[in-house]
Amino acid sequence: MKRQSLETIHLDKIVGGGQALGTLADGRKCFVWGGLPGETVTVRITKKKSHLVEAVVEEVISPSPDRIQPRDPDSYLSTSPWQIMPLEVEQTYKAQLIDDAFALHNVTLPAAIDIYCDNVAYGYRNKVEFSWYSESVVSRAVSQKKSGLVSGPELFSDNNQDIDADSDREESSGDTLDLAFFRRGSKGKIVIDGTSLAHPAINNLARAIRNLLRHKRVAARQLKTLLVRCDQSGSCVWQLYVKDRLPEIITATEAAKLPAQGGEIIYSDPRSPASRITERLALFGNTTLTDAILGIPFRYACEGFFQVNIPVYEKALRDMKEWVSRESSYWQLEHHQKIIRDPRKVAQIFSEVLLAADRPTLDLYAGVGTIGLTIGSGNVTLVEINADAVREMQRNITELDRTDAHAVLAPSEQALDYITGREIVIVDPPRAGLHTDVIATLLQQLPPRIIYLSCNPVTQARDVALLQQNYHIVHHRGYNFFPRTPHIEHLIILDKKP
């Protein structure tokens, strides 16, 4: 049996990844999940490096006054590690992390950080991917428990090396399966019945599929994941990813009885851990969902990209729209009049503002078009690298009869000719931030305004630090798209310097 590595440490602060930070006796930094600043805790080391370690809390010796009981005590570390703090405390930490990110890159934000939240902390997710856990492993653990080898919460713990949720040789084709999440910091799994983050319809459908498969004598080693998605009304679609070609594991009659509008069985190459589509084995019902964003309907596939917290996303879009509209252009004129004394310069800016009100819009990293097609101008170009997303985008453009919208299938860094300096540019990049070629072209062509929505304030701050040579920040705001998690969205409006 592998020996556990336990340490008792004091936690000092929350850091960018969402962990609490402490220091081991040997001076190495310890990044801890499940802890809060000010606490003294015993942690289990999950990863060791020469200059740092990662760990999870095993015991809280001296709790923070902010600590609360997590809604999902067994699985919260896997999905939403900030369930241990009140929502208002979470808001404070998220503002702090944004501030820290920009301070790291010597970027001064012009106002105090405001984090918008609609105060819906649970039940907001419209998409969840579940893993599987074979009942035969649990049966083996139960027999050990009866003999005194395993007890209490250790039943599904990584502490017992004889219980390996990932070991195919421990599984059999028994009658029972369980839904599961991967345990943070290990390869083990945690048996679940659902997650409090999800829309209730998602949990209900996942349990229904689990209950159906329990009678199929199928082992977890034959399955990869279950992806469930719902629209705002609670109508669901599902995709069952399998490692063996099992097209009849769910029949059409059985699928029709599930609480879903449609679903698919998908063979996914077992050589890859990711749930990628290798072959579509069976299709049931209608697997395309439709949701309205700011009153505009969008179609999207179960596996496609779409926002998981639509109400908060819509608030971000409304805020962004103000900076595409004529009203925000006049705000820009008023702002410059206060700082520029030369009347000829003011007249030039006034002329530019009138033109800006009717400028085209360029939406980079556009996804299925939910930004450009809702808040973009009458002339909008949308650039996206994912072919499936572009197909959905083009379908949305056609159904909306948007003859003034143009979809481009390309990486943003290979669509630089669309940055001409005339358009308002909207960017919503992945966590890696803007490609260096995109930044270089923006600095060369100098569009009048850049609207930058980011899911990673650290890379956003890095990019803004480079853009600041020709741009200044006129507005910023944070958004809590993912309550109970460390993830943050942050909006920056950059205007070209006069």
Give names to the regions the model predicted.
Residues G188-K224, C230-D231, D244-I265, R271:
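Internal alpha/beta scaffold segment
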Residues R140-S157, Q161-I163, D168-S173, Q332:
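Intrinsically disordered, low-complexity segments enriched in serine/proline and basic residues
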Residues I113-V120, T225-R229, G478-F481:
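Short, solvent-exposed loop/turn elements at beta->coil junctions and helix N-caps
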Residues K2-H10, G16, L155, H215, ...:
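Rossmann-like S-adenosyl-L-methionine
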Residues E58-R71, Y76-V138, K145, R169-A220:
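Extended interfacial segments that mediate partner engagement and assembly in macromolecular machines
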Residues M1-D74, G174:
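Terminal RNA-binding accessory module
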Residues V137-V138, V142, V150, I163, ...:
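Short hydrophobic transmembrane-like helices used for membrane targeting/insertion
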